[in-house]
């Protein structure tokens, strides 16, 4: 699936939170492939910039914050 497909699923509030979090990590994987880093490195960068741990997000709001950072990384690198 593409970044945008995972993004849509992450934003779908009818999906269980755990599935939405999984789609956020899939977005991180696709960003990592684009910029040449590992998925874990991207997740660490997101956490350092936003304080959101994508391995254990606490709320839908955190997922949105992380998504915004992932989109910025995707477009600026």
What would you call each of these model-derived segments?
Residues 1-77:
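Alpha-helical propensity feature that highlights long, continuous alpha-helices across diverse contexts
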């Amino acid at each position: 699936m593409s970044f945008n497909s995972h993004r849509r699923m992450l934003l779908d509030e009818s999906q269980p939170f755990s599935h939405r979090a999984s789609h956020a990590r899939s977005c991180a994987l696709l960003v990592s492939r684009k910029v040449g880093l590992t998925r874990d490195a991207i997740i660490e960068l997101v956490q350092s910039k936003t304080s959101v741990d994508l391995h254990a997000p606490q709320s839908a709001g955190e997922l949105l914050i992380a998504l915004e950072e992932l989109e910025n990384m995707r477009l600026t690198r």
